[in-house]
């Protein structure tokens, strides 16, 4: 049996690599929004949309009158078209809403499928158009690499997810036995209690982290730029990064617990 697995690692790009990542993120967002704008016109007229291959064939012509698109990874631009095609397929199959325009605020990411260039070694990873990038991760995919997704989180930290295929033995279903069953019940002054008498208390670090984020958000609301329509000052952006990092810290605490 073949399974898709992924390794997510934080990366530390230098100034030049960081610039290239930000450029690719912006160009992929531009392609996605431009294709969505064109597909919206087609949908209003004929209730259909351009498929992936039709959108992909438009890219070479766009690069002729928009030469700055050549700065980005070509595979990443194609994958932006593929994402939009998937979104429209979900919409027409009534499993999702109408696709929305991408914004430069919040989490951003792009995916590259050039597997001939993608390489993972201990403490470094090689990506198309970027070269080798430092990472604290020592795990190496033990299968064939499918694609890599580079993301910029709201706390200004860069990550890459390497998706690969791995062949594993077939899973044998386990038949539950009475002696292997554990019952859980609600505990009013804690988290839970099990059928063996073991109890677990509610972790207090989560509430403490939430209170810290509330204080940071209160300071953010007093900075110039917190009101709608105001220009975002440098102090506002600095405080916003602190809030985002605290939110990421809380999410990691919940995930680890």
Residue ranges and their predicted role:
Residues 53-153:
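Acidic carboxylate diad motif detector
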């Amino acid at each position: 049996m073949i399974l898709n697995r992924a390794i997510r690692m934080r990366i530390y790009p230098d100034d030049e690599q960081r610039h290239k990542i930000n450029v690719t993120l912006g160009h992929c967002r531009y392609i996605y929004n431009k294709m969505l704008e064109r597909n919206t016109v087609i949908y209003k007229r004929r209730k259909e949309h351009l498929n992936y291959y039709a959108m992909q064939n438009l890219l070479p012509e766009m690069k002729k009158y928009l030469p700055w698109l050549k700065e980005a990874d070509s595979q990443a631009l194609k994958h932006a078209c593929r994402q939009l095609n998937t979104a429209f397929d979900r919409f027409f199959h009534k499993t999702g809403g109408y696709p929305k325009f991408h914004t430069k605020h919040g989490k951003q990411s792009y995916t590259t499928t050039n597997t001939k260039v993608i390489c993972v070694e201990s403490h470094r990873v090689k990506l198309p158009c970027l070269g080798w990038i430092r990472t604290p991760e020592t795990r190496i995919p033990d299968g064939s690499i499918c694609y890599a997704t580079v993301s910029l989180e709201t706390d200004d930290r860069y990550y890459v997810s390497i998706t690969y295929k791995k062949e594993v033995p077939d899973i044998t279903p386990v038949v539950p036995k009475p002696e292997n069953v554990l019952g859980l019940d609600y505990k009013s002054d804690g988290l839970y209690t099990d059928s063996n008498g073991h109890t677990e208390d509610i972790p207090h670090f989560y509430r403490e982290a939430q209170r810290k984020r509330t204080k940071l958000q209160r300071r953010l609301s007093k900075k110039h730029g917190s009101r709608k329509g105001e220009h975002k000052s440098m102090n506002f952006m600095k405080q916003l990064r602190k809030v985002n990092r605290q939110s990421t810290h809380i999410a990691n605490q919940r995930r680890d617990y």
